[in-house]
């Protein structure tokens, strides 16, 4: 897996002449309580969410360090330790907060080199396939916002000066207000 990711990053950098932005959007989700979460699913969520974010960022960083306005953007929640975020989905919360911890640590680690590392999270559900297929079907999609709000918010973050805007945990509509 690591070799495949490195090859993909290198191929992309070769094709486009470098890497300016790394968006860690891939995610595995299962909103089950502790007793309902099997370890295979727990491992999958942590491998994709936390480990995948760390590894993808790590492999992109040599290219980002050469870019003019380099950004890493993780789609992960603010580091809010309120137990309500963990109560019914401990495994998923651990995996997503792992992505957020990458923001906290990498933002500080690469601040002096000018690589911005930030997080973006939606205030409410976004109408995606995951929401439809896993979180509640068509009824949930009907009351969800469209993905464009996240795209617009990501654009705002990724066009900011990387030397000045790093280590932030942004909520989509706050950023666009």
Language-model regions: role of each:
Residues 18-20, 100-103, 110-122, 164-170:
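Conserved Rossmann-fold SDR core element
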Residues 25-30:
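Conserved NAD(P)H cofactor-binding loop of Rossmann-fold oxidoreductase domains
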Residues 33-34, 38-44:
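Substrate-binding pocket helix/loop in short-chain dehydrogenase/reductase
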Residues 57-58, 104:
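A short, exposed helix-loop element centered on a Lys and neighboring polar residues
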Residues 65-66, 71-112, 121-125:
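Catalytic loop of short-chain dehydrogenase/reductase
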Residues 119-120, 137-177:
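C-terminal helical subdomain
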């Amino acid at each position: 897996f690591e070799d495949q990711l490195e090859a993909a990053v290198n191929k992309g950098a070769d094709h486009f002449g470098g890497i300016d932005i790394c968006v860690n959007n891939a995610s595995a989700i299962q909103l089950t309580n502790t007793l309902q979460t099997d370890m295979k699913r727990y491992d999958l969520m942590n491998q994709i969410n936390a480990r995948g974010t760390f590894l993808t960022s790590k492999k992109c960083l040599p290219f980002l360090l050469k870019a003019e306005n380099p950004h890493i953007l993780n789609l992960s929640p603010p580091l809010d330790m309120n137990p309500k975020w963990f109560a019914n989905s401990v495994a998923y919360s651990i995996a997503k907060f792992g992505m957020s911890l990458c923001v906290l640590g990498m933002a500080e680690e690469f601040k002096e080199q000018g690589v911005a590392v930030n997080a973006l999270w939606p205030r409410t559900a976004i109408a995606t396939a995951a929401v439809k297929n896993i979180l509640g079907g068509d009824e949930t999609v009907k009351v969800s916002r469209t993905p464009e709000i996240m795209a617009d918010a990501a654009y705002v973050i990724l066009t900011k000066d990387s030397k000045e805007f790093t280590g932030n945990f942004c909520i989509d509509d706050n950023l666009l207000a």
